[in-house]
Amino acid sequence: MPRIAALPDHLVNQIAAGEVVERPANALKEIVENSIDAGATAIDVELDGGGIRLIRVSDNGSGIHPDDIELALHRHATSKIKTLNDLEHVASMGFRGEGLASIASVSRLTLTSRQEDSSHATQVKAEDGKLSSPTAAAHPVGTTIEAAELFFNTPARRKFLKSENTEYAHCATMIERLALAHPHIAFSLKRDGKQVFKLPAQSLHERIAAIVGDDFQTASLEIDSGSGALRLYGAIAKPTFAKGKTDKQYCFVNHRFVRDKVMLHAVKQAYRDVLHNALTPAFVLFLDLPPEAVDVNVHPTKTEIRFRDSRQVHQLVFHTLNKALADTRADLTESVSNAGEVLHDITGVTPAPMPSENDSENLFNRASDYPTGNKPDTRNAFGSSGKTAPMPYQSAYAPQQRSLSLRESRAAMNTYAELYKKTDDIDLELSQFEQARFGNMPSETPAPKTDTPLSDGIPSQSELPPLGFAIAQLLGIYILAQAEDSLLLIDMHAAAERVNYEKMKRQRQENGRLQSQRLLIPITFAASHEECAALADYAETLAGFGLELSDMGGNTLAVRAVPTMLGKADVVSLARDVLGELAQVGSSQTIEEHENHILATMSCHGSVRAGRQLTLPEMNALLRDMENTPRSNQCNHGRPTWVKLTLKELDALFLRGQ
């Protein structure tokens, strides 16, 4: 067996380079982060051959002292930490002192730097790990680092590099992440001598638009929330902007781009109820917290981290995003502060609050939304205070949109209300509903003739609710509604599906425990030994989820009670899934996940179907419910429930004004 011997420093550096510098983008990241730590306000990046032939980074930072310039290229030489306590509280991008030494060992590196109080710059070169003597050079205040011929002395490593275009794409992505994390710094990027972009110092809002795109900015919701020493802010895309790729997902912790499972899981959970199929959300999230609350010294590239309290981080991310997405309904804006506080609404009227979890009011029994009398304490459709939205059927617009008399539409109203009566178990007094909502509307009287132009009878912007008023039904599928300077198309089945789904979920949350119903005849099934053991160990857990099972002996189990909401589910399959998971992990989310699936299915089958003819009062009642329902912009499967065509877009279809 060979004797043990210490490795030469140059080989050690090359081994370290294999961890830190996998490709040109990693070398670029290490150099640019040094510029950021130096307090630079402008960073210029030049790439040649995708960063393989040349990486040049120039900054206007504080520079390096002439006596330290050689030391800067040695391993574990840094000005950022001195003690273990410094490491635990590190706030700088770099701190190990490995980056430049690793790059110098696998490239031809030139370092030129000048401090403000120096009369000239100092330059040092490194090739194959060997340093030249420092020399005087001409250079403005700041630092320029050139790394040429990356991996020239490790041909095996160079063979693993991709094409120049691919390596450039990785470098450009890296610069975009760094620019996004530090909007106060101006960045420029050149590729093979051609300017790719030049970003001035900007606000975060402007930088997001410049990097992620104006389309994301238009379709995003701003968030800003805090919990103790933690602050989460940034922008998340509406569910309708979701893509099949993850290229527009950015997580920053203390302005460092990371790939963290805790944050990504929280984001996924928040979007779970509004995304369609395999689509992924787009987001730019910034989490600021004390440096000692996160360990960044986990991976050489520092993209993996560990939180001291991952549960707190998960809850902050989940609840902030969940609240923001829940407030994406027609009467709310896209700006959310402090985990969902609404700043203002699109009409200038105070928006309606989210329905209370204790609110057992029938979804159609909303006489207070559009009062027929002058009740000072009656809530209007936009909120509990502010301007009062007038009763739509008392305006001059009402006779023009009435297609059926109240007497003719009674049968349809009974049918539609019955759908909600089944989910609410609340007796809908239709006569009171009609009197409250349509008491002043003429029943059989034809629309009065008037010399006033049609446009004069349309309510002003302050009178129109966010989704406007229904004017017709199209092909038995869509509701056409007129809002301020726009035409809305609403998928009535998808909209009713979301309204029902959210109401049933709210009922579930109010109880805290799934209500169960006993089966008239218990259902038995043959169980495995593991399933029988799980029942013996977790009988109370099952009871809390509304499942009551008993062991009949001989590996036979009997289901005696199931959750009320899941009465029509496959009882045996549900019991097996829960028992199987309990046997493996000792806890279960199967019931909750299954319940959400069943709730979605129930709301789908319990909602108004395509082809069903609705009256205008029914259509308008659905629109008002959408305005007061969280996540009403999407159905339970993530599909949009409504779209808008502006007057400008309609004019363009007919070439008006061209």
From Swiss-Prot:
Record flagged with keyword DNA damage: yes
InterPro entries per UniProt: DNA_mismatch_repair_CS, DNA_mismatch_repair_MutL, DNA_mismatch_S5_2-like, HATPase_C_sf, MutL/Mlh/PMS, MutL/Mlh/Pms-like, MutL_C, MutL_C_dimsub
This protein's name: DNA mismatch repair protein MutL
Biased composition (Basic and acidic residues): 114-130
Keywords assigned by UniProt, alphabetized: DNA damage, DNA repair
Positions of region (Disordered): 114-137, 369-401, 438-457
Biological-process GO terms, alphabetical: mismatch repair
Function according to Swiss-Prot or TrEMBL: This protein is involved in the repair of mismatches in DNA. It is required for dam-dependent methyl-directed DNA mismatch repair. May act as a 'molecular matchmaker', a protein that promotes the formation of a stable complex between two or more DNA-binding proteins in an ATP-dependent manner without itself being part of a final effector complex.
UniProt GO molecular function: ATP binding; ATP hydrolysis activity; ATP-dependent DNA damage sensor activity; mismatched DNA binding
